[in-house]
Amino acid sequence: MTRWEIARERSHRHFASAPFVASAAASGGAGAAVRDGDGDKTYEAIIVVAGGMTDDGGLPAWVTSRLDFVKEEYDRHVAAKREAPYVVLAGSATPHKPPPLAKGGFLLHESTAMATYLADRGVPRAKMLKDTASMDTIGNAYFTLTSHAIPRGWRDVLIVTSKFHMGRTRAAFEWVWNLYVPSSDGAGAAAGDAAPSAPHVRLSFHATPDDGLDASVIEARAAREAKSEAALRKNATEVTTLAAFAEWQFTTHMCYAVLRQDEIGEFEEMKTDPALKSY
């Protein structure tokens, strides 16, 4: 098989998310919040990865845990009289179940629901940015990079998600964001340029507790997460430029490829999977 055929086959098998498995990004007891980095560090942006919604458009406890930490981190910057970071809310919907609808029958994006939650708790709307294109973790990484980080020239970014989701999140963001090669004039380098030896953007990660999930759900999700993380890290060794990544994502991935768009809306695989309760 060619390199692209191998990547395509992997994408067909491993496009979804799964529970947290211990990695350099997060460790410790079940449900513990784990931080990688300096608690006094200043960030230009905090990205919170979406984690699903209830059928009526509410946010589950493991998602509000992420957002409550983001509010604390935002307030820490303000209290220290540092420049307030942007808060990026990453996620549209999940491919694993139908999305709830908003006013007027429009899709209620997960990022919109998260923005409302933070706005109600005092985070200024002018400091929040949305990604309404991504449907999974690798999409979160790609669209936050290309829509927000590159145009704004960010160099220090904090990524927030739940403990069960951190392994795959770290694999996705480190793969995609480390492909970005800026040119000397501040614009993006040629799309096919190889990734630099040192990342242009410094990424930190924070894992929040798996609130609201029982052990059986976390165990089921963890099995899915482990497979997805392994597939991401394997693909990262074969897809090594941003141009190659875009080709891979938009021609092989179920959530983004026209070739596979008819697969969206088929939920049979997930109906009996306990992990569905974590989406």
Residue positions per predicted region:
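A structured, mid-to-C-terminal "fold-capping" secondary-structure block
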Residues: H206-Y279
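A structural signal for short, hydrophobic/glycine-enriched beta-strand patches
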Residues: T2-S228, Y279
